[in-house]
């Protein structure tokens, strides 16, 4: 099947793109075209106008500042994967990027495109949820910021309005001091090019990395493809906060996660399997993040 006929637009600035969105209510945005082309070819979307933002200036960058990390919406997955500056301060993000499909997709697919698609299996959606990111979006009327925990509304539905363009995603570094924070992304895929069966992001900050049993000051645990939207398990996080990590605590967290996730059954993974996988990934990811917070190797 081929896409239905449409009129193609290729703006060069964000202002031009938002003006087109304001003038063309039926228009859809195209970024790296790694998913949208498939959707169009199967006629799951038949817009009269397609706005290709791949040539829009100023949307492809990774800016690691003293207080904030900002990633432009048109930044390729490969850019994130190979960013040494990003790996030093938020290693969770490039670690997840390297597990997105294969090199061809990573060299074309974009961070903003993944977030805008809002597939619950998306790696970036999972990691950025754990990091309390916020998204900057723009329209012809101005810009606004959306906290990521308010961004995903339902399956493949976001808080971005039809006339808005995702500009960037930002993460405050305040909660993640490099010297005592560990991060881990864990994923299972049937093959390199497939979506994750399930993914997990863990972030752990300890009080004293040199102590025999460091106490966890802050913990984050989120999942990909474990519900209709990317899922963060706050109850599991609360269980480990204020305690040194132990095998007993990990088992308790695993039980909490098993009950908290709401996975959809798939051909190759039923609901029970995904629940068990989420519980296993919770243990594994938290344990590794805890070790990394102490400067220990896996």
Q: Language-model features: where?
A:
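C-terminal structural segment of proteins
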Residues: 1-298
């Amino acid at each position: 099947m081929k896409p239905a006929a449409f009129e193609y637009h290729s703006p060069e600035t964000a202002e031009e793109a938002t003006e087109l969105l304001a003038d063309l209510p039926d228009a859809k945005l195209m970024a790296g075209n790694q998913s949208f082309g498939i959707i169009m070819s199967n006629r799951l979307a038949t817009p009269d106008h397609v706005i290709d933002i791949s040539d829009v200036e100023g949307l492809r960058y990774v800016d690691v500042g003293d207080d904030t990390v900002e990633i432009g919406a048109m930044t390729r997955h490969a850019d994130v994967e190979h960013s040494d500056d990003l790996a030093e301060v938020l290693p969770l993000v490039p670690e997840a990027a390297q597990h997105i499909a294969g090199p061809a997709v990573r060299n074309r697919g974009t961070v903003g495109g993944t977030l805008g698609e809002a597939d619950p299996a998306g790696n970036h959606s999972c990691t950025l949820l754990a990091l309390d990111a916020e998204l900057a979006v723009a329209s012809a009327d101005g810009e606004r910021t959306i906290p990521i925990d308010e961004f995903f509304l339902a399956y493949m539905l976001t808080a971005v309005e039809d006339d808005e363009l995702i500009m960037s995603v930002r993460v405050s570094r305040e909660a993640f001091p490099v010297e005592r924070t560990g991060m881990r992304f864990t994923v299972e895929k049937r093959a390199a090019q497939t979506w994750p069966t399930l993914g997990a992001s863990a972030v752990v900050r300890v009080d004293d990395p040199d102590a025999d049993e460091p106490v966890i000051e802050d913990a984050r645990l989120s999942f990909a493809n474990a519900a209709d939207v990317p899922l963060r398990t706050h109850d599991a996080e609360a269980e480990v906060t204020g305690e040194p990590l132990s095998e007993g605590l990990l088992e308790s967290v695993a039980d909490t996660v098993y009950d908290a996730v709401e996975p959809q059954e798939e051909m190759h993974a039923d609901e029970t399997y995904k629940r068990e996988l989420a519980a296993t990934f919770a243990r594994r990811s938290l344990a590794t993040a805890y070790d990394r917070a102490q400067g220990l190797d896996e």
